[in-house]
Amino acid sequence: TYHITASRDGFYVNSSSLVRFSPEPYSEARGGQSSARDAEFYQAHSLIALLRRLSPRFARGLDDLQKEMSQREAVEVLPFVSAEQAASPWLVRGNENRVPQTYDVGQPQEIYLRLGAQAADSLRDWNEELQSIREMPRSNLSERVVRDRQLHKWYSEFAEAAIQGAMAVVDGEMPPLNPTDPDEQHMYLRDNIFYSKGFDGRETFTELGGDAAAHVATGKDITGVRLLNQLDIDGLHTLGSVVVDYRGLRVVAQSVVPGIFRRQETTQIVYGSVDSGVTVGADEDFHKLLEPVAKALHFGEHAVADEAGNEVKLYTSADVKGLTGTDGRKYLLDLFRMTPMDIEFLESQCTEGQDAVADSALPVYHHRLVLLRPELLDIFWENSVRKAVQEYAVEKAKRSQKEESKAEGQTEGEGSDAAKQPAETADKDKDGETKPSSDDALPEFEFSLDFSPDAFTPLQARLKAKEGEGSESAMDAAVRSASRFLRDVSVPAFARELASYTTSPLSGDALVTAMHQRGINMRYLGAIANLLPSDVEIVRNVRRLVVFEMVSRAVKHIVRGLFQATPAHLHSEALALVLNALVGTRRCASPAEHLSAEAKAVPQLAALTPELLADEVRAQVALRFRFELAADFVESMVAGNERILLREVCQKIGVQLALRQYHFEQPTESDVYSEIVSSMGFGSGKMTKTTKRQVRERVDEVMQQKLVVESDDVLNFVALTKVSTHNSSFADEAFEAGRMSLEQGQRQMGLELLLESLALHEQTFGFLHAESARCYAVVSLAHYDAGEHELAADFMTKAV
C-alpha cells in the first residue's frame, strides 16, 4: 500500500503506514538506502505518471482503457462544460433499435468533486451563487474568462434543475404553496427555485389580453433579462430565469430574491409600480443606477403619474420593478416591457372598428402586449444617425459653397466696399478676431433620439389627461417612427431578400433567426407571405416555408389547448390524432375512428376531424399572423410536403417520434419489404430463416397500419426552454472582429482573431456547444477559401 501526498511540485510517495502518519518523502525516509533513481521513481509531476510507475497492473489497465476510448465516437469521450438544453431530435430510435450505451460511473460523482460530500446533499442557494459570480473581478482577460465560464456553468446547472422542477409541476408531482387558490394561481418552491404558471392568475394583464398577454410577457421577460445580462452593469442584479414549455403548459422558473417571502412594514418595491400604476416609486439610487442602461437601450427620462396624480421621472417602464433585497443588492424584476409598443400595429390590428380590421375578414388581434424587438430599435437608431449625418454633410456642403461664392463676391468688390464697416457681415469676439455671423454659422453636429418604454400606455395617457396635452412628445414620435419603420421598411426589405434569395433560410428555425436579427416579430409572418408572389416558381418554395411556419405555430397552440383538456396519459393519442388529421388525410380520412374507447370519451378528441382541424388552423393563422390561408391549403400546399410540416410541428411542440419510415399514402408490400430489409442492414445479402420470418412479421405489421402516426410512435415529450444565457462578450468581440477582417481581405489578422475567439469559446463553453461549433465552422470556411482543404475539413468535422 502506498500513501501519496500532493504538493506544489507534484505528487510523491510519503512514509506513512496504516498506523502512522509521516508526510516525509519515502525516498528520504530510507536514508542511506535511497538514491537519485529512487527519488525520481517515487515522485512525479502527474498523478497518472506516478501511479504507472508504482503499479504495472494500473499501467496495463490504463493502456487498455485508452485503446477502448480511441475506438469510440468523439462525442462520447470529449469533456463538456454543459449546455442550456440537451439536444432533442424529433426522431429517435425505439427500444428495438436502440444503440447500447455505456454508463459513465464518473458523472454522478462530479457534484461531490465540486461541492464536497456535505454540500452536495444540501440545498443550493441559486441566487447567492449567481450574484457572487457576477461580483467576481474582471479587470483582465484571465479574470473575465474565469468569470464567464462560471456564469455559463451556473446558468446551465440552473436550467437543468429548473427543467426538472417544471416537468414535475406539469406532471403534478410538486405540491403548491397555495393549494386553496385556483390552479392558474398556484405557486411552487423546490430546491430554492420558484415556479409559477404562465397564466394571468392575478388579473394583471386583464386590459392587455388576459392569459394570452401573460403568456407573451413570460417570454419577453427572458428577453429583458438577457438584455441586462449583456450590458452587465455593476450593482444592478437580475434573477436567474428559465421559461419551460412542456405538455401544453408554460412554467416560469426563477431564483428566489432574498427576503421576498418575508412580511415587512415598508414595501420593498422602490422603483416602478407593483399595482398597475396606483403607486409609482422612483428611488434616486435606482434612477442613477439605470442611467447607463437607458443610454445603451436609447431610453429617455420620461414622466409618469400615479393614481393620485403625483408625477415621477423614470428611465424604464413603470411595469419594471426595482427591489432592494435583504442582502442589500438592487434587483430588477418583471422585465417584459423593456421595449416600447408597436403602436402602428396596436392601433390598426388590436382595436375593433379600425379600418385595417374592419375592411378585412381578419379578427381583432388576441392581445395588446405588442412590443418592438430590441434589434429593431438598434437598427432604427443607426439608420436615423446615418440619415442625420448625411443631412448634416449636405447642409455643410451647401454652406461651404455659399461662403465660397460670397468670398468671391467680396474679392471683386473689395475696392469699392473698402470704406464700409464689416460689422454687418461679421462679428468680433473678445480677442478681436473676426468670425462668421451667427446667422450663417453651422452648429456642431448633434444627434439625440430617445424612446419611452411607457409611450402610449395607460399611465402616460393619465399624465397627458392631467396636463391637458394632446400632441405627441418627441419620444412618443420616435416610438411611432420606429413602428412605421418596421412596417414600411424592415418587413418589405426582408421579403425582397427572401424573393431574391439574398437570404435563404432552409428551415423554420433559420427563418425565425433571420427575422429576429432584423428586429421583425413573428406576428409579421403573414405580411411577409403577402409580399411574396405565389405565382412565381422561384419564390414558391420560400413562401411555402413562411406559410408552414405559421401553420406549425397555429398547430402548436391547438395542441396546447387539447393537452389542457385531456388527461396526461392520453396526450400521445391526442397528438397522434392531430398529426394524422394534418398530414395523414391521404392515407386515412377519419383518424378519430381509430381512437381508443377512453380517448373517444373526451369530446374534444372525438369531434376532431381533418376538416375541423383545417378550419381551426385557418382561424389561428388569421388571428395570430394576419394571413388568410386558402380553404384547400391541405391539398394545395401540405400534400407532397407532409414530412417537412411534420418535422416543423414536432419541433414546435417538443415531441420525439419513433425513427422509422412514415408512409403518407398506402404503401405497396414490395416497397415496405425493401425498406425493412435495407433498414436491418441486409441489402441483397443472404438472410436466415429466422431473419426472413422477422422481416415478414414486420411487413405484415406495417401493412396493417391504418394511420401515418400511431400513438405508440410518440415516444417522448421534451421540455422546450428559453434561458437568459450569458455570452462571453470578449469572445464575441474577437469573433466579430475576425469576421470583419476576413471580409476586408485581411486574412492573416482575421484568422488570428477567429482562433483567439475559438480558444475563448472553448474555455468558456467547452467543445460541445453551439457557440464553439459556430467558431469552428467560420474558421473552416476561412481555411477553405485559402485552399487549405485538409484543415477546413478538420475544423468542419469538429463543428459537426
Walk through the language-model features, giving the residues of each.
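Amphipathic, interaction-prone secondary-structure segments
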Residues: 1-8
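Aromatic/acidic cage segments in peptide-binding pockets
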Residues: 8-48, 268-274, 337-381, 793-799
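Intrinsic-disorder-linked linear interaction elements in eukaryotic regulatory proteins
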Residues: 341-384, 389, 396-800
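ATP-dependent carboxylate/phosphate-activation module, predominantly the ATP-grasp catalytic core
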Residues: 236, 242-292, 342-391, 395, ...
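Eukaryotic beta-rich interaction modules
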Residues: 1, 198-200, 206-238, 294-307, ...
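Conserved metal-phosphate-binding beta-hairpin within the catalytic cores
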Residues: 316-341
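Glycine-centered motif in EGF-like
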Residues: 21-90
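Extended, well-ordered protein cores
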Residues: 140, 144-295, 302-305
